[in-house]
Structures are given as C-alpha cells and as structure tokens.
C-alpha cells in the first residue's frame, strides 16, 4: 500500500497481566500487501496515574516500583510485540522502567494518563521517553506557571515570541 494509512499500532488498554499475555501474541508486527501493516502493539498501562486514568480499570493499575515489566507483559511480548508503551513518568519506579523499556527492549515510551509536572516530564524525557499520548487530555493543562507534560515535550511550539 502506497498511500493512506500504511501502518498502525493496535492499542491495548490497562488489563490484567494474564490478559496482556493472552492478547499481545496476536499483535506482532506483520505486513499485509494490500492493507495497512500492523507495526506492533501500543500498550496503555498499567502504569498510569489514578487521577488521570480515564476509562482504564483502576483494579488492574500498578505502581512501577513494585511491578516487574516481565511479570506484567511477558519477556517475549516486550522483545517482539510491544513497540510503544504509555506510562505516567511521575510514578515511583517509572524512570527505571522507561530506561529499561528503551535500552533493553527497544520500546518507544510515551508519557500519558499522567499528573506529571514539567520537571517530572523532563526526567521522563531524560530517561528515554520521547512521545506524549493524548496531548492535552488525561494530563494537567498547559498553564503559564506550570507547563506540565505538553509544555515539556513541545516547548518550541509554546515559547516562541
């Protein structure tokens, strides 16, 4: 396929670890000659801020510091299926997970469903996160005294005079 949507990341919301392990094997990267290709999975959660959870099930949410990536998703899924993962960088242990996802598994980390302030967003970016999920939604608003995640990630758009 040469025009239009040529590839996409199917998204899995916050679910139980057993359901992640059941669903993710079906979302491996795969090319389809006459259709959009599956680029791998985008996983939202379970490391999200409870105050910004939106429709995500709080019963399945985890704190990164007390949860192993491998236990939640399975190592095979981390290596070969998950290509983008959204988490809240301000949670305890999130920076360690960001660095491990990026360096050990090659997963692109997106910050979202987060109550992070500018500094927490900056620490997330320094650890390896390079995307924002739902910019301006499920996060604190952009404010002139507290720019938050959006202000940290996209300063060139907001700070021009």
Name each region found by the language model.
Residues 1, 28, 96-105:
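Surface-exposed amphipathic alpha-helices with a cationic face
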Residues 1-22, 36-49, 78-90, 107-110, ...:
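Divalent metal-dependent hydrolysis catalytic cores, especially in the metallo-beta-lactamase
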Residues 12, 55-63, 108-112:
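Active-site mouth loops of central-metabolism enzymes
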Residues 65, 89-90, 113-117, 139-148:
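A general structural motif
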Residues 97, 120-161:
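Active-site-adjacent C-terminal substructures of enzyme catalytic domains
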